[in-house]
UniProtKB/Swiss-Prot annotation:
Active site: 337 (proton acceptor), 361 (proton acceptor)
Chain positions recorded as Mn(2+) binding sites: 337, 361, 528
Record's keyword terms, sorted: Carbohydrate metabolism, Cytoplasm, Fucose metabolism, Isomerase, Manganese, Metal-binding
Classification of source organism: Bacteria, Pseudomonadati, Pseudomonadota, Gammaproteobacteria, Enterobacterales
Pfam family, one: Fucose_iso_N1
EC number: 5.3.1.25
Entry annotated with the keyword Isomerase: yes
Protein name: L-fucose isomerase
Location in the cell: Cytoplasm
Organism: Klebsiella pneumoniae (strain 342)
GO molecular function list: arabinose isomerase activity; L-fucose isomerase activity; manganese ion binding
Matching HAMAP family: Fucose_iso
Cofactor(s) needed for function: Mn(2+)
Gene: fucI
Length: 591
Protein backbone atom coordinates (compact mmCIF):
# COMPACT_ATOMS: atom_id res chain seq x y z
CA UNK A 1 0.00 0.00 0.00
CA UNK A 2 1.34 3.44 -0.93
CA UNK A 3 2.22 5.53 2.11
CA UNK A 4 0.22 8.76 2.36
CA UNK A 5 2.46 11.79 1.96
CA UNK A 6 2.68 14.41 4.69
CA UNK A 7 1.14 17.85 4.13
CA UNK A 8 3.53 20.60 3.14
CA UNK A 9 3.50 24.35 3.74
CA UNK A 10 3.30 26.50 0.63
CA UNK A 11 5.09 29.85 0.61
CA UNK A 12 3.60 32.48 -1.73
CA UNK A 13 5.87 35.48 -2.45
CA UNK A 14 3.62 38.26 -3.81
CA UNK A 15 4.90 41.36 -5.56
CA UNK A 16 3.95 44.63 -7.23
CA UNK A 17 3.50 43.65 -10.88
CA UNK A 18 4.46 46.97 -12.47
CA UNK A 19 7.44 46.45 -14.75
CA UNK A 20 9.96 49.04 -15.95
CA UNK A 21 11.65 49.21 -12.57
CA UNK A 22 9.16 48.49 -9.79
CA UNK A 23 8.86 44.70 -9.94
CA UNK A 24 12.48 44.29 -10.93
CA UNK A 25 13.66 46.17 -7.83
CA UNK A 26 11.60 43.92 -5.55
CA UNK A 27 12.16 40.43 -6.97
CA UNK A 28 15.18 39.51 -4.84
CA UNK A 29 13.82 40.96 -1.59
CA UNK A 30 10.44 39.29 -2.02
CA UNK A 31 11.83 35.87 -2.90
CA UNK A 32 14.33 36.12 -0.03
CA UNK A 33 11.43 36.65 2.38
CA UNK A 34 9.91 33.43 1.08
CA UNK A 35 13.18 31.54 1.42
CA UNK A 36 13.76 32.85 4.94
CA UNK A 37 10.26 31.81 5.97
CA UNK A 38 10.72 28.34 4.52
CA UNK A 39 14.12 27.95 6.19
CA UNK A 40 12.72 28.97 9.58
CA UNK A 41 9.84 26.51 9.41
CA UNK A 42 11.94 23.61 8.12
CA UNK A 43 14.53 24.20 10.83
CA UNK A 44 12.16 24.66 13.77
CA UNK A 45 9.17 22.41 13.08
CA UNK A 46 8.52 18.70 12.70
CA UNK A 47 5.42 16.72 11.94
CA UNK A 48 3.97 14.68 14.80
CA UNK A 49 5.66 11.64 13.26
CA UNK A 50 9.05 13.34 13.64
CA UNK A 51 9.70 14.13 9.97
CA UNK A 52 10.94 17.61 9.14
CA UNK A 53 8.30 19.95 7.76
CA UNK A 54 8.80 20.55 4.06
CA UNK A 55 8.02 23.90 2.45
CA UNK A 56 7.20 24.51 -1.20
CA UNK A 57 7.89 27.95 -2.65
CA UNK A 58 6.08 29.24 -5.73
CA UNK A 59 8.29 29.14 -8.83
CA UNK A 60 7.93 32.89 -9.36
CA UNK A 61 6.75 35.88 -7.42
CA UNK A 62 3.00 36.39 -7.75
CA UNK A 63 1.74 39.66 -9.18
CA UNK A 64 -1.69 38.69 -10.47
CA UNK A 65 -4.16 36.04 -11.52
CA UNK A 66 -1.93 34.10 -13.92
CA UNK A 67 0.98 33.63 -11.53
CA UNK A 68 -1.42 32.93 -8.67
CA UNK A 69 -3.01 30.14 -10.72
CA UNK A 70 0.40 28.71 -11.60
CA UNK A 71 1.31 28.69 -7.92
CA UNK A 72 -1.93 26.92 -7.05
CA UNK A 73 -1.29 24.25 -9.67
CA UNK A 74 2.13 23.57 -8.16
CA UNK A 75 0.76 23.46 -4.63
CA UNK A 76 -2.08 21.12 -5.62
CA UNK A 77 0.39 18.65 -7.08
CA UNK A 78 2.62 18.65 -3.99
CA UNK A 79 0.08 18.15 -1.18
CA UNK A 80 0.33 21.67 0.21
CA UNK A 81 -2.09 21.89 3.12
CA UNK A 82 -1.17 25.29 4.58
CA UNK A 83 -0.05 28.54 2.92
CA UNK A 84 1.86 31.61 4.02
CA UNK A 85 1.88 34.64 1.72
CA UNK A 86 4.83 37.01 2.18
CA UNK A 87 5.60 40.44 0.76
CA UNK A 88 7.66 43.55 1.50
CA UNK A 89 5.61 45.80 -0.77
CA UNK A 90 2.28 46.83 -2.22
CA UNK A 91 0.59 44.18 -4.38
CA UNK A 92 -2.86 43.76 -5.85
CA UNK A 93 -5.00 42.46 -2.99
CA UNK A 94 -7.74 40.13 -4.18
CA UNK A 95 -5.78 39.25 -7.34
CA UNK A 96 -2.96 37.63 -5.37
CA UNK A 97 -4.55 35.98 -2.33
CA UNK A 98 -4.93 32.25 -1.71
CA UNK A 99 -8.60 31.49 -2.33
CA UNK A 100 -8.73 27.86 -1.16
CA UNK A 101 -11.46 27.97 1.53
CA UNK A 102 -10.27 24.86 3.39
CA UNK A 103 -6.56 25.61 3.66
CA UNK A 104 -5.29 27.57 6.69
CA UNK A 105 -3.59 30.72 5.45
CA UNK A 106 -1.53 33.59 6.80
CA UNK A 107 -0.04 36.75 5.31
CA UNK A 108 3.23 38.30 6.48
CA UNK A 109 3.48 41.94 5.46
CA UNK A 110 7.00 43.27 6.05
CA UNK A 111 7.10 46.30 8.36
CA UNK A 112 9.27 48.66 6.33
CA UNK A 113 9.00 52.24 5.15
CA UNK A 114 10.40 52.08 1.63
CA UNK A 115 7.54 49.93 0.28
CA UNK A 116 4.10 49.50 1.89
CA UNK A 117 4.04 45.81 2.87
CA UNK A 118 1.62 46.73 5.64
CA UNK A 119 -0.74 48.35 3.16
CA UNK A 120 -0.90 45.18 1.09
CA UNK A 121 -1.44 43.16 4.25
CA UNK A 122 -4.43 45.30 5.19
CA UNK A 123 -5.85 45.27 1.66
CA UNK A 124 -5.47 41.51 1.29
CA UNK A 125 -7.01 40.84 4.69
CA UNK A 126 -9.95 43.06 3.76
CA UNK A 127 -10.46 40.92 0.67
CA UNK A 128 -10.30 37.74 2.74
CA UNK A 129 -12.87 39.14 5.17
CA UNK A 130 -15.20 40.28 2.41
CA UNK A 131 -15.02 36.90 0.67
CA UNK A 132 -15.54 34.91 3.89
CA UNK A 133 -12.13 33.21 3.79
CA UNK A 134 -10.41 34.07 7.09
CA UNK A 135 -6.65 34.58 7.15
CA UNK A 136 -4.09 35.24 9.87
CA UNK A 137 -2.20 38.54 9.95
CA UNK A 138 1.55 38.72 10.60
CA UNK A 139 3.07 42.17 10.96
CA UNK A 140 6.24 42.93 12.89
CA UNK A 141 6.02 45.30 15.85
CA UNK A 142 9.10 47.31 14.85
CA UNK A 143 10.10 48.90 11.54
CA UNK A 144 12.90 47.08 9.72
CA UNK A 145 15.31 48.41 7.13
CA UNK A 146 14.70 47.28 3.57
CA UNK A 147 17.90 45.23 3.49
CA UNK A 148 17.24 43.55 6.85
CA UNK A 149 16.66 39.87 6.08
CA UNK A 150 16.20 38.77 9.68
CA UNK A 151 12.88 37.54 11.03
CA UNK A 152 11.98 39.43 14.24
CA UNK A 153 11.09 37.37 17.31
CA UNK A 154 7.43 38.43 17.30
CA UNK A 155 7.07 37.54 13.62
CA UNK A 156 8.80 34.20 14.20
CA UNK A 157 6.44 33.37 17.06
CA UNK A 158 3.38 33.99 14.89
CA UNK A 159 4.80 32.16 11.89
CA UNK A 160 5.56 29.07 13.97
CA UNK A 161 2.29 29.14 15.93
CA UNK A 162 0.32 29.45 12.71
CA UNK A 163 2.35 26.72 11.02
CA UNK A 164 1.98 24.28 13.93
CA UNK A 165 -1.77 24.73 14.07
CA UNK A 166 -2.17 24.73 10.29
CA UNK A 167 -0.26 21.48 9.95
CA UNK A 168 -2.47 19.92 12.63
CA UNK A 169 -5.53 20.86 10.56
CA UNK A 170 -3.99 19.47 7.38
CA UNK A 171 -2.77 16.29 9.09
CA UNK A 172 -6.19 15.39 10.51
CA UNK A 173 -8.02 15.96 7.24
CA UNK A 174 -8.88 12.72 5.45
CA UNK A 175 -7.97 10.48 8.39
CA UNK A 176 -10.34 8.46 10.55
CA UNK A 177 -11.28 7.93 14.17
CA UNK A 178 -11.52 4.22 14.97
CA UNK A 179 -14.46 3.71 17.31
CA UNK A 180 -13.77 0.26 18.72
CA UNK A 181 -17.01 -0.55 20.47
CA UNK A 182 -19.88 1.75 21.33
CA UNK A 183 -21.04 3.77 24.31
CA UNK A 184 -19.19 3.04 27.54
CA UNK A 185 -21.27 3.32 30.72
CA UNK A 186 -23.35 6.18 29.32
CA UNK A 187 -20.33 8.47 28.87
CA UNK A 188 -21.42 11.18 26.43
CA UNK A 189 -18.04 11.44 24.73
CA UNK A 190 -18.42 7.84 23.59
CA UNK A 191 -21.66 8.69 21.78
CA UNK A 192 -19.48 9.28 18.74
CA UNK A 193 -20.75 12.21 16.67
CA UNK A 194 -19.96 11.53 13.01
CA UNK A 195 -21.03 15.02 11.97
CA UNK A 196 -18.53 16.60 14.36
CA UNK A 197 -15.66 14.60 12.92
CA UNK A 198 -16.74 15.19 9.33
CA UNK A 199 -17.72 18.87 9.50
CA UNK A 200 -15.19 20.28 11.94
CA UNK A 201 -12.16 18.00 11.51
CA UNK A 202 -12.52 16.65 7.97
CA UNK A 203 -12.29 13.10 9.34
CA UNK A 204 -14.36 9.95 9.01
CA UNK A 205 -15.49 7.61 11.78
CA UNK A 206 -14.77 3.91 11.40
CA UNK A 207 -17.12 2.04 13.73
CA UNK A 208 -15.95 -1.49 14.55
CA UNK A 209 -17.51 -3.85 17.06
CA UNK A 210 -15.27 -5.21 19.82
CA UNK A 211 -15.89 -8.70 18.45
CA UNK A 212 -13.41 -7.81 15.70
CA UNK A 213 -10.72 -7.45 18.36
CA UNK A 214 -11.80 -10.79 19.82
CA UNK A 215 -11.61 -12.38 16.35
CA UNK A 216 -8.12 -11.09 15.71
CA UNK A 217 -6.87 -12.41 19.03
CA UNK A 218 -8.60 -15.80 18.78
CA UNK A 219 -7.70 -16.41 15.14
CA UNK A 220 -4.10 -15.21 15.54
CA UNK A 221 -4.49 -12.29 13.17
CA UNK A 222 -1.27 -10.74 14.40
CA UNK A 223 2.49 -11.16 14.12
CA UNK A 224 3.25 -14.13 16.38
CA UNK A 225 6.96 -13.38 16.40
CA UNK A 226 6.25 -9.87 17.64
CA UNK A 227 4.09 -11.27 20.43
CA UNK A 228 7.03 -13.28 21.73
CA UNK A 229 9.19 -10.16 21.59
CA UNK A 230 6.55 -8.16 23.47
CA UNK A 231 6.28 -10.80 26.19
CA UNK A 232 10.05 -10.93 26.64
CA UNK A 233 10.15 -7.14 26.84
CA UNK A 234 7.42 -7.09 29.48
CA UNK A 235 9.22 -9.79 31.47
CA UNK A 236 12.31 -7.58 31.51
CA UNK A 237 10.71 -4.22 32.25
CA UNK A 238 7.42 -4.71 34.10
CA UNK A 239 7.43 -4.30 37.88
CA UNK A 240 4.28 -5.62 39.47
CA UNK A 241 2.56 -3.76 42.27
CA UNK A 242 0.17 -4.55 45.05
CA UNK A 243 -2.79 -6.82 44.43
CA UNK A 244 -5.63 -5.26 46.44
CA UNK A 245 -8.17 -7.91 45.47
CA UNK A 246 -9.79 -10.21 47.99
CA UNK A 247 -8.21 -13.66 48.11
CA UNK A 248 -10.99 -15.30 46.10
CA UNK A 249 -10.36 -12.91 43.21
CA UNK A 250 -6.58 -13.10 43.08
CA UNK A 251 -5.13 -14.86 40.06
CA UNK A 252 -2.29 -17.37 40.17
CA UNK A 253 0.87 -17.01 38.11
CA UNK A 254 -0.50 -18.95 35.13
CA UNK A 255 -3.70 -16.92 35.07
CA UNK A 256 -1.79 -13.65 35.39
CA UNK A 257 0.46 -14.67 32.52
CA UNK A 258 -2.59 -15.27 30.33
CA UNK A 259 -3.95 -11.82 31.24
CA UNK A 260 -0.61 -10.20 30.37
CA UNK A 261 -0.46 -12.02 27.04
CA UNK A 262 -3.97 -10.94 26.08
CA UNK A 263 -3.26 -7.35 27.17
CA UNK A 264 -0.22 -7.18 24.90
CA UNK A 265 -2.19 -8.76 22.07
CA UNK A 266 -4.86 -6.10 22.48
CA UNK A 267 -2.19 -3.42 22.06
CA UNK A 268 -0.84 -5.09 18.93
CA UNK A 269 -4.24 -5.67 17.36
CA UNK A 270 -5.59 -2.18 18.10
CA UNK A 271 -2.43 -0.73 16.57
CA UNK A 272 -2.81 -2.94 13.49
CA UNK A 273 -6.45 -1.90 13.14
CA UNK A 274 -5.44 1.74 13.26
CA UNK A 275 -2.49 1.84 10.88
CA UNK A 276 -2.28 -1.58 9.27
CA UNK A 277 0.56 -4.08 9.34
CA UNK A 278 2.26 -5.54 6.24
CA UNK A 279 3.18 -8.65 8.25
CA UNK A 280 -0.47 -9.67 8.12
CA UNK A 281 -0.43 -9.59 4.33
CA UNK A 282 2.47 -12.05 4.42
CA UNK A 283 0.11 -14.41 6.27
CA UNK A 284 -2.49 -14.00 3.52
CA UNK A 285 -4.58 -11.56 5.55
CA UNK A 286 -4.50 -8.74 3.03
CA UNK A 287 -7.73 -7.01 4.06
CA UNK A 288 -6.75 -6.94 7.73
CA UNK A 289 -3.25 -5.73 6.86
CA UNK A 290 -4.58 -2.41 5.54
CA UNK A 291 -5.97 -1.04 8.79
CA UNK A 292 -8.51 1.78 8.92
CA UNK A 293 -6.33 4.85 8.26
CA UNK A 294 -6.97 5.92 11.86
CA UNK A 295 -5.06 8.84 13.35
CA UNK A 296 -6.89 8.31 16.66
CA UNK A 297 -8.97 5.58 18.25
CA UNK A 298 -11.10 4.79 21.26
CA UNK A 299 -11.82 1.50 23.00
CA UNK A 300 -15.15 1.05 24.79
CA UNK A 301 -14.03 -1.72 27.11
CA UNK A 302 -16.43 -1.20 29.96
CA UNK A 303 -18.43 -3.12 30.50
CA UNK A 304 -19.27 -5.45 27.64
CA UNK A 305 -15.61 -6.41 27.22
CA UNK A 306 -14.19 -5.97 30.71
CA UNK A 307 -16.79 -8.10 32.48
CA UNK A 308 -15.20 -11.17 30.89
CA UNK A 309 -11.91 -10.17 29.21
CA UNK A 310 -8.83 -8.25 30.43
CA UNK A 311 -9.39 -4.50 30.44
CA UNK A 312 -7.75 -2.04 28.06
CA UNK A 313 -5.51 -0.32 30.59
CA UNK A 314 -2.24 -2.00 29.62
CA UNK A 315 -2.93 -1.81 25.89
CA UNK A 316 -3.99 1.84 26.04
CA UNK A 317 -1.12 2.88 28.32
CA UNK A 318 1.46 1.30 26.03
CA UNK A 319 -0.09 2.60 22.81
CA UNK A 320 -0.35 6.13 24.22
CA UNK A 321 3.30 6.04 25.32
CA UNK A 322 6.31 6.96 23.19
CA UNK A 323 7.90 3.52 23.44
CA UNK A 324 7.21 -0.20 23.58
CA UNK A 325 9.01 -3.45 22.73
CA UNK A 326 10.01 -1.95 19.38
CA UNK A 327 11.85 0.91 21.11
CA UNK A 328 11.10 4.62 21.04
CA UNK A 329 8.44 5.53 18.49
CA UNK A 330 5.60 7.95 17.84
CA UNK A 331 2.84 7.59 20.43
CA UNK A 332 -0.62 6.59 19.30
CA UNK A 333 -3.80 8.34 20.38
CA UNK A 334 -6.21 5.90 22.03
CA UNK A 335 -9.04 7.17 24.22
CA UNK A 336 -10.21 5.21 27.23
CA UNK A 337 -13.89 4.23 27.28
CA UNK A 338 -14.10 5.35 23.64
CA UNK A 339 -14.38 8.98 24.83
CA UNK A 340 -13.97 10.36 21.34
CA UNK A 341 -14.09 13.99 22.47
CA UNK A 342 -11.21 13.47 24.87
CA UNK A 343 -9.56 11.58 22.04
CA UNK A 344 -9.82 14.68 19.86
CA UNK A 345 -8.19 16.77 22.59
CA UNK A 346 -5.42 14.15 22.74
CA UNK A 347 -5.08 14.27 18.97
CA UNK A 348 -4.81 18.06 18.96
CA UNK A 349 -2.15 17.99 21.67
CA UNK A 350 -0.14 15.31 19.91
CA UNK A 351 -0.29 17.06 16.56
CA UNK A 352 0.82 20.36 18.10
CA UNK A 353 3.69 18.97 20.17
CA UNK A 354 4.69 15.52 18.93
CA UNK A 355 4.46 14.28 22.52
CA UNK A 356 2.47 11.59 24.29
CA UNK A 357 -0.78 12.69 25.92
CA UNK A 358 -2.02 11.87 29.42
CA UNK A 359 -5.67 10.80 29.51
CA UNK A 360 -7.17 11.22 32.98
CA UNK A 361 -10.32 11.47 35.01
CA UNK A 362 -10.75 14.96 36.45
CA UNK A 363 -11.48 13.22 39.69
CA UNK A 364 -11.37 15.37 42.82
CA UNK A 365 -10.87 18.97 43.94
CA UNK A 366 -8.93 19.05 47.19
CA UNK A 367 -9.28 22.38 48.99
CA UNK A 368 -6.49 23.54 51.34
CA UNK A 369 -8.86 23.10 54.30
CA UNK A 370 -9.86 19.58 53.29
CA UNK A 371 -6.25 18.50 52.80
CA UNK A 372 -5.23 19.86 56.19
CA UNK A 373 -8.22 18.24 57.85
CA UNK A 374 -7.42 14.83 56.37
CA UNK A 375 -3.61 14.88 56.56
CA UNK A 376 -2.80 17.42 59.24
CA UNK A 377 -0.47 19.17 56.80
CA UNK A 378 -1.00 22.40 54.83
CA UNK A 379 -0.68 22.70 51.06
CA UNK A 380 2.22 24.94 50.07
CA UNK A 381 3.85 26.42 46.98
CA UNK A 382 1.87 26.14 43.77
CA UNK A 383 -0.56 23.85 45.58
CA UNK A 384 -1.44 26.42 48.25
CA UNK A 385 -4.82 27.31 46.69
CA UNK A 386 -5.88 23.69 46.24
CA UNK A 387 -5.24 20.89 43.77
CA UNK A 388 -7.11 18.71 41.30
CA UNK A 389 -6.52 14.96 41.43
CA UNK A 390 -6.11 13.65 37.88
CA UNK A 391 -6.31 9.88 37.99
CA UNK A 392 -7.77 7.03 35.96
CA UNK A 393 -7.59 3.27 36.01
CA UNK A 394 -4.21 3.04 34.37
CA UNK A 395 -4.37 3.96 30.68
CA UNK A 396 -2.32 7.18 30.91
CA UNK A 397 0.83 7.39 28.79
CA UNK A 398 3.84 6.24 30.81
CA UNK A 399 5.65 9.38 29.66
CA UNK A 400 3.40 11.07 32.22
CA UNK A 401 5.71 9.90 35.00
CA UNK A 402 8.00 12.68 33.69
CA UNK A 403 11.22 10.70 33.99
CA UNK A 404 12.52 12.32 30.80
CA UNK A 405 14.71 15.41 31.17
CA UNK A 406 14.97 18.67 29.25
CA UNK A 407 18.24 20.48 28.45
CA UNK A 408 18.30 22.02 31.93
CA UNK A 409 17.72 18.68 33.63
CA UNK A 410 14.10 19.37 34.53
CA UNK A 411 11.47 16.60 34.43
CA UNK A 412 9.37 16.73 31.27
CA UNK A 413 7.72 14.80 28.45
CA UNK A 414 9.71 15.08 25.23
CA UNK A 415 8.70 14.80 21.60
CA UNK A 416 9.39 11.20 20.73
CA UNK A 417 12.26 12.05 18.39
CA UNK A 418 14.19 13.54 21.33
CA UNK A 419 13.67 10.65 23.76
CA UNK A 420 16.69 8.49 24.61
CA UNK A 421 16.22 4.79 25.31
CA UNK A 422 17.42 5.24 28.88
CA UNK A 423 14.63 7.80 29.42
CA UNK A 424 12.05 5.34 28.15
CA UNK A 425 13.50 2.74 30.51
CA UNK A 426 13.28 5.24 33.38
CA UNK A 427 9.56 5.75 32.70
CA UNK A 428 9.05 1.99 32.79
CA UNK A 429 11.08 1.72 36.00
CA UNK A 430 8.88 4.40 37.61
CA UNK A 431 5.74 2.41 36.76
CA UNK A 432 4.20 -0.49 38.62
CA UNK A 433 1.61 -2.78 37.07
CA UNK A 434 -1.11 -3.59 39.57
CA UNK A 435 -3.74 -6.29 39.11
CA UNK A 436 -7.06 -4.72 38.17
CA UNK A 437 -9.66 -4.37 40.90
CA UNK A 438 -12.14 -7.23 40.42
CA UNK A 439 -15.19 -5.18 41.39
CA UNK A 440 -14.47 -2.88 38.45
CA UNK A 441 -12.88 -5.33 36.00
CA UNK A 442 -14.10 -8.90 36.35
CA UNK A 443 -12.01 -10.03 33.40
CA UNK A 444 -8.81 -8.84 35.04
CA UNK A 445 -6.04 -6.74 33.61
CA UNK A 446 -3.17 -4.62 34.86
CA UNK A 447 -3.33 -0.95 35.75
CA UNK A 448 -0.23 1.19 35.38
CA UNK A 449 0.66 3.04 38.58
CA UNK A 450 2.98 6.04 38.63
CA UNK A 451 3.20 9.48 40.20
CA UNK A 452 3.89 12.48 37.97
CA UNK A 453 6.88 14.49 39.15
CA UNK A 454 6.12 17.97 40.42
CA UNK A 455 6.91 21.35 38.93
CA UNK A 456 6.16 20.35 35.34
CA UNK A 457 4.14 22.82 33.21
CA UNK A 458 1.05 21.24 31.65
CA UNK A 459 -1.96 22.32 29.63
CA UNK A 460 -5.21 20.50 30.40
CA UNK A 461 -7.80 20.42 27.61
CA UNK A 462 -11.18 18.99 26.77
CA UNK A 463 -13.60 19.14 23.83
CA UNK A 464 -17.34 19.12 24.62
CA UNK A 465 -20.37 19.21 22.33
CA UNK A 466 -23.22 21.53 23.30
CA UNK A 467 -26.58 21.03 21.58
CA UNK A 468 -27.48 24.11 19.56
CA UNK A 469 -23.92 25.42 19.73
CA UNK A 470 -21.64 22.62 18.59
CA UNK A 471 -18.16 21.76 19.85
CA UNK A 472 -16.31 23.93 22.35
CA UNK A 473 -12.79 23.67 23.75
CA UNK A 474 -11.66 24.11 27.35
CA UNK A 475 -8.06 24.96 28.26
CA UNK A 476 -6.39 25.19 31.67
CA UNK A 477 -2.67 25.85 31.92
CA UNK A 478 -0.98 24.90 35.18
CA UNK A 479 1.62 22.69 36.81
CA UNK A 480 1.98 19.26 38.33
CA UNK A 481 2.81 19.50 42.01
CA UNK A 482 4.77 17.22 44.32
CA UNK A 483 3.16 16.57 47.68
CA UNK A 484 4.98 15.31 50.77
CA UNK A 485 4.99 11.51 50.62
CA UNK A 486 2.79 11.01 53.66
CA UNK A 487 0.25 13.51 52.31
CA UNK A 488 0.23 11.88 48.86
CA UNK A 489 -0.16 8.40 50.30
CA UNK A 490 -3.15 9.44 52.42
CA UNK A 491 -4.94 11.29 49.63
CA UNK A 492 -4.14 8.71 46.94
CA UNK A 493 -5.39 5.83 49.07
CA UNK A 494 -8.80 7.49 49.38
CA UNK A 495 -9.34 6.97 45.63
CA UNK A 496 -7.25 4.09 44.34
CA UNK A 497 -3.55 3.70 45.00
CA UNK A 498 -3.11 1.24 42.11
CA UNK A 499 -3.76 3.92 39.47
CA UNK A 500 -1.52 6.67 38.02
CA UNK A 501 -1.79 10.07 39.70
CA UNK A 502 -1.05 13.65 38.70
CA UNK A 503 -1.65 16.42 41.23
CA UNK A 504 -2.54 19.46 39.14
CA UNK A 505 -2.59 23.13 40.13
CA UNK A 506 -4.10 25.38 37.44
CA UNK A 507 -2.78 28.90 37.02
CA UNK A 508 -5.33 31.27 38.53
CA UNK A 509 -6.31 34.65 37.09
CA UNK A 510 -8.74 35.79 39.77
CA UNK A 511 -11.54 35.96 37.22
CA UNK A 512 -14.40 33.71 36.12
CA UNK A 513 -13.63 29.99 36.01
CA UNK A 514 -10.05 30.73 37.07
CA UNK A 515 -10.95 32.76 40.14
CA UNK A 516 -9.97 29.74 42.25
CA UNK A 517 -9.14 26.07 41.81
CA UNK A 518 -12.64 25.00 42.86
CA UNK A 519 -14.08 27.04 39.97
CA UNK A 520 -11.79 25.31 37.47
CA UNK A 521 -13.10 21.94 38.60
CA UNK A 522 -16.70 23.19 38.76
CA UNK A 523 -16.58 24.60 35.23
CA UNK A 524 -14.93 21.56 33.63
CA UNK A 525 -17.37 20.21 31.07
CA UNK A 526 -16.93 16.46 31.48
CA UNK A 527 -15.40 13.75 33.63
CA UNK A 528 -12.26 13.44 31.49
CA UNK A 529 -9.41 15.72 30.48
CA UNK A 530 -6.05 15.56 28.72
CA UNK A 531 -2.65 16.76 29.89
CA UNK A 532 -0.28 18.07 27.22
CA UNK A 533 3.25 19.02 28.20
CA UNK A 534 4.08 22.73 28.39
CA UNK A 535 2.00 25.87 28.47
CA UNK A 536 0.69 25.50 24.93
CA UNK A 537 -2.81 26.89 25.36
CA UNK A 538 -2.11 29.59 22.78
CA UNK A 539 -1.44 26.93 20.14
CA UNK A 540 -4.73 25.21 21.01
CA UNK A 541 -6.56 28.54 20.66
CA UNK A 542 -5.09 29.14 17.20
CA UNK A 543 -5.95 25.59 16.10
CA UNK A 544 -9.49 25.88 17.45
CA UNK A 545 -10.05 29.11 15.51
CA UNK A 546 -8.92 27.42 12.29
CA UNK A 547 -11.47 24.65 12.89
CA UNK A 548 -14.18 27.14 14.01
CA UNK A 549 -14.37 25.64 17.50
CA UNK A 550 -14.92 28.40 20.09
CA UNK A 551 -12.91 28.32 23.31
CA UNK A 552 -15.30 28.52 26.27
CA UNK A 553 -12.71 28.56 29.05
CA UNK A 554 -9.00 29.38 29.15
CA UNK A 555 -6.33 31.11 31.21
CA UNK A 556 -3.96 32.08 28.39
CA UNK A 557 -2.51 35.59 28.47
CA UNK A 558 -4.32 37.94 26.09
CA UNK A 559 -1.07 38.88 24.34
CA UNK A 560 -0.60 35.26 23.21
CA UNK A 561 -4.04 34.82 21.68
CA UNK A 562 -3.72 34.54 17.90
CA UNK A 563 -6.78 34.18 15.70
CA UNK A 564 -7.69 35.18 12.12
CA UNK A 565 -7.87 38.92 11.55
CA UNK A 566 -11.60 38.80 10.75
CA UNK A 567 -12.34 37.85 14.36
CA UNK A 568 -11.72 41.52 15.26
CA UNK A 569 -14.79 42.53 13.26
CA UNK A 570 -17.05 40.40 15.46
CA UNK A 571 -17.08 42.71 18.49
CA UNK A 572 -14.63 44.16 21.00
CA UNK A 573 -14.47 41.38 23.62
CA UNK A 574 -12.11 38.74 22.32
CA UNK A 575 -13.99 35.73 23.71
CA UNK A 576 -17.31 36.96 22.34
CA UNK A 577 -15.55 37.58 19.02
CA UNK A 578 -14.56 33.93 18.97
CA UNK A 579 -18.11 32.67 19.45
CA UNK A 580 -19.60 35.05 16.90
CA UNK A 581 -16.92 34.35 14.30
CA UNK A 582 -17.17 30.58 14.69
CA UNK A 583 -20.95 30.80 14.33
CA UNK A 584 -20.67 33.14 11.35
CA UNK A 585 -18.21 31.03 9.37
CA UNK A 586 -19.47 27.65 10.53
CA UNK A 587 -17.42 24.45 10.65
CA UNK A 588 -14.38 24.37 8.38
CA UNK A 589 -15.72 21.45 6.33
CA UNK A 590 -19.35 22.56 6.16
CA UNK A 591 -21.92 19.78 5.74
Amino acid sequence: MKKISLPKIGIRPVIDGRRMGVRESLEAQTMNMAKATAALISEKLRHACGARVECVIADTCIAGMAESAACEEKFSSQNVGVTITVTPCWCYGSETIDMDPLRPKAIWGFNGTERPGAVYLAAALAAHSQKGIPAFSIYGHDVQDADDTSIPADVEEKLLRFARAGLAVASMKGKSYLSLGGVSMGIAGSIVDHNFFESWLGMKVQAVDMTELRRRIDQKIYDETELEMALAWADKHFRYGEDQNAEQYKRNETQSRAVLKESLLMAMCIRDMMQGNPKLAEKGLVEESLGYNAIAAGFQGQRHWTDQYPNGDTAEALLNSSFDWNGVREPFVVATENDSLNGVAMLMGHQLTGTAQVFADVRTYWSPDAVERVTGQPLTGRAEHGIIHLINSGSAALDGSCQQRDAQGNPTMKPHWEIEQNEADACLAATEWCPAIHEYFRGGGFSSRFLTEGGVPFTMTRVNIIKGLGPVLQIAEGWSVALPKAMHDQLDARTNSTWPTTWFAPRLTGKGPFSDVYSVMANWGANHGVLTIGHVGADFITLAAMLRIPVCMHNVEAAKIYRPSAWAAHGMDIEGQDYRACQNYGPLYKR
